[in-house]
A protein has these predicted regions:
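Cell-wall glycan-active module
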Residues: 2-3, 8-9, 23-367
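Bacterial N-terminal signal peptides
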Residues: 13-23
Length: 367
């Protein structure tokens, strides 16, 4: 289920993906020229020995590469396998520990926020659901995000209190073997190569769908990075978060301010007269940059796109920061984000995630 920083990153990635998808219509990359059988053979070889149904995993990964015109290089194959191993251990619809407790907590939290008494919640959950069981019985038996997503969909669609609590918003926002964001998948389904019998949400919880959209989120955009670890960090924190965290660091060095290097250079929804931390610090450089507040805002609005790396603002800020530091500062940094989710039972960060995936990636390249 989605966390606040992660949800912002999903929205950022979905928006960026839509922009890139439109831009790529006229300039789609050529289809991979490698024979599909060769690609599948390499995928099988590079998987850990313990993985079951290796041929099926390989087929779905190869299909996703071909449909999205992503070159199936060893590096790209291992990037996908590393994320999949980290996120699910090669389980299409992985179980989540303590999910019934987590789900009931979410329902109770929403009820409390709306001042709905507990007895009304209990009465709503006692209603018989479309599969014949009560919602309370189903809630006690959920084991996977797909189970919970289907329960929420039925609860919202069939029980008045469900619609009141969730307002047509299903709290399950990630799923599948690569734990990809469902909003991202829904925004990027135009080239999905399989028939959709239910919804894109349903497809995310399958092996083929989870891999297709996970691969799109991981590899479906160009980056300025020279190391895969920054792409892995972006997978967790949002497209271009590593590039933007480095930009925040440059702003901090150039101004002498302490900034959170979280990759969010614009506070979501902030009006022009109430800028976020990074934008506020950047305004101190406005006279040196020859840019007023409105111009800075417009420039920062490109930070979810590749071309921000080549923008005048990016170049000028790094020129000032490099001069002050007396050396060239990094152009990519893993964002400093603490992962926050009911599914997480210990303190983890984006850096931890990216480095864990990078370790699996390097092991894969050696197989």
């Amino acid at each position: 289920m989605t966390t606040s920083p992660a949800f912002r990153s999903l929205l950022r990635a979905a928006t960026s993906a839509s922009i890139l998808m439109l831009a790529s219509c006229a300039t789609a990359p050529p289809a991979p020229t490698r024979p599909p059988a060769d690609t599948r053979s390499e995928i099988v070889r590079r998987m850990p020995a313990k993985v079951a149904d290796r041929d099926r995993w390989a087929a779905d990964i190869e299909t996703a590469f071909a449909a999205q015109r992503i070159e199936p290089t060893s590096e790209n194959i291992c990037a996908v396998l590393a994320i999949t191993e980290q996120e699910s251990g090669y389980v299409a619809n992985p179980a989540v520990a303590n999910l019934p407790k987590i789900a009931r907590g979410e329902i109770d939290r929403r009820a409390a926020a709306l001042h709905v008494p507990k007895f009304m919640v209990d009465a709503a959950l006692a209603v018989r659901s479309p599969d014949g069981r009560s919602y309370a019985e189903r809630l006690r038996s959920v084991r996977t995000e797909r189970d919970l997503s289907e329960l929420y969909e039925d609860l919202i669609g069939s029980v008045p209190l469900g619609k009141r609590l969730f307002a047509d918003y299903n709290p399950v926002q990630t799923g599948g073997p690569m734990q990809v964001g469902i909003p991202f998948a829904e925004a990027n389904a135009s080239r999905y190569p399989y028939p959709v019998e239910g919804s894109i949400r349903d497809e995310v919880f399958t092996r083929r769908g989870g891999l297709y959209f996970g691969i799109a989120h991981l590899l479906g955009y160009q980056t300025p990075y020279t190391r895969k670890v920054h792409r892995f960090a972006d997978y967790n924190a949002g497209w271009y978060a590593s590039r933007n965290a480095a930009f925040q660091n440059a702003v901090a060095v150039a101004t002498g301010n302490t900034l959170a290097l979280d990759g969010d250079v614009l506070a979501p929804g902030a009006p022009l007269d109430k800028p976020g931390q990074t934008e506020r610090a950047l305004r101190e450089l406005g006279p040196q940059l020859g840019m007023d507040n409105a111009q800075l805002r417009r420039a920062l609005q490109q930070a979810d796109q590749l071309q921000f790396s080549d923008s005048a603002l990016h170049a000028q800020v790094f020129a000032l920061a490099d001069a002050r530091a007396g050396k060239a500062l990094p152009r990519a940094l893993i964002p400093g984000i603490r992962l926050d989710s009911p599914k997480i039972t210990r303190e983890l960060t984006t850096e931890w995630f990216a480095n864990r995936v990078d370790g699996r990636y390097r092991q894969c390249l050696q197989r």
